[in-house]
Amino acid sequence: MTVLIQGAGIAGLALAREFTKAGIDWLLVERASEIRPIGTGITLASNALTALSSTLDLDRLFRRGMPLAGINVYAHDGSMLMSMPSSLGGNSRGGLALQRHELHAALLEGLDESRIRVGVSIVQILDGLDHERVTLSDGTVHDCSLVVGADGIRSSVRRYVWPEATLRHSGETCWRLVVPHRLEDAELAGEVWGHGKRLGFIQISPREMYVYATLKVRREEPEDEEGFVTPQRLAAHYADFDGIGASIARLIPSATTLVHNDLEELAGASWCRGRVVLIGDAAHAMTPNLGQGAAMALEDAFLLARLWCLAPRAETLILFQQQREARIEFIRKQSWIVGRLGQWESPWSVWLRNTLVRLVPNASRRRLHQRLFTGVGEMAAQ
C-alpha cells in the first residue's frame, strides 16, 4: 500500500523527499492545476536547514538565495530595539533567505514526477482495518497505509480529522512584496515597529529585496477593502517612519510583486485520526512573526518520516503529535506575542514596549534562541 500526500507545498514536497529516501512508495496530489508557490520571499533559520539537509544539498540550495546572519529590530524613529541571530552560535552557516519559487524548485528537483498529480484532490476517506480507502477527484480509488494532509491553512483533509477546527484572526493584515534593491548589509534582515504597524525587509537575491508590511485591523472589516491597495497607497501608511524604516517605505512603490492576506493561526487538539495525519499549516498554522512556519513544516516532515519507517501503524501518528505539540505550541505563542506587541498604537504604550524590549537581558534572549533553533534535526544529530 502507498502513502498518499495531499498538498504540493513545502510540507508535502519535503515529506515526499523523505519517503523517497526511505524507499517508501508515495503518491502526491495537488488540487491546483499546477504547482505554483503562492507568496514572495521566505527565510529559513538553522533548524529549518538542518531538517532540509536530510534530503537536499545545502550548498546548492544556498546558491538559490542569500545567506542570512540575523535580524535587527528597530523602533519607528530608526533606533535599535534588539538583534536576533538566525542560528545557534555553533552553526557557522546561519540562515537563508530566498524566493519561495526557488525553494519549491529545489524540493521538486529529483522527485519522480509520475507520482505527482495536479488538479486532483481527496474527495472521500473511508476507514479500513489496516488502511484508509481514499477516493480522488479523478475517480480513482486507493488503499493507503497512510494519508497525510499537507494542504495548508485552508486544508480540506482537516475537515476529516478535525471538523470543528477554526482559524483565529491575529488582528493584523499583511502585504508581501518584492522590490529591486540591494541592502548595504545584505546578510542582515530588519523589522521596524511603529504604532500598530510593522515593516520588514530581507535580501533574497543579489538584486531583490523581500518586504512585508503589516497593519492592525478589525476582523469585521472586509478583507477586500484592505486587499485592494496599490504599492503607492501602502507606502503612505509608513510615512511617519524615520531612518531605515523611511528608506524601506520609499522603495514600496517600485514593487514588482504584491501579495495580501490576513494573518491567522490555528491551535487545537487533534492532528490525526486513524491513519490520517495533518502536518505543517494544515495542523498548526501560526503567525509568521518569528519566521518559523516553514521550519515547523520541515521539522514535521523530518520526524514523521522517521517515525513511520520505524513503526508504520496508526499509533505512530499519536506519538508524532505528542513529540511535536509542545514545541509547536511554544513557538506559536511566542509568534503571537510578537504580533501583539507590534499592534500597540498609543504613544505611551509604544514607548513602554520599546523600553521593555531593550531591557530584556541577553541571557534571556539566548535561551529563546536556543529553544527556537534546536529542532528535531538537531536533536536527532545529538
UniProtKB/Swiss-Prot annotation:
Keyword Oxidoreductase: yes
GO molecular function: 2-heptyl-3-hydroxy-4(1H)-quinolone synthase activity; FAD binding; monooxygenase activity
Source organism, top-level taxon: Bacteria
UniProt keyword list: Monooxygenase, NAD, Oxidoreductase, Quorum sensing
Catalytic activity: 2-heptyl-4(1H)-quinolone + NADH + O2 + H(+) = 2-heptyl-3-hydroxy-4(1H)-quinolone + NAD(+) + H2O
One Pfam family named in its UniProt record: FAD_binding_3
Enzyme class, spelled out: oxidoreductase
GO biological process, one term: quorum sensing
Keyword NAD: yes
InterPro entries: FAD-bd, FAD/NAD-bd_sf, MOase
This enzyme's EC code(s): 1.14.13.182
SUPFAM superfamilies: FAD/NAD(P)-binding domain (SSF51905)
Function in brief: Involved in the terminal step of the biosynthesis of quinolone which in addition to serve as a potent signal for quorum sensing, chelates iron and promotes the formation of membrane vesicles (MVs). Catalyzes the hydroxylation of 2-heptyl-4-quinolone (C7-HHQ) to yield 2-heptyl-3-hydroxy-4-quinolone (PQS).
Family membership noted in the UniProt record: Belongs to the 3-hydroxybenzoate 6-hydroxylase family.
Record's protein name: 2-heptyl-3-hydroxy-4(1H)-quinolone synthase
UniProt organism field: Pseudomonas aeruginosa (strain ATCC 15692 / DSM 22644 / CIP 104116 / JCM 14847 / LMG 12228 / 1C / PRS 101 / PAO1)
Phylogenetic classification of the source organism: Bacteria, Pseudomonadati, Pseudomonadota, Gammaproteobacteria, Pseudomonadales
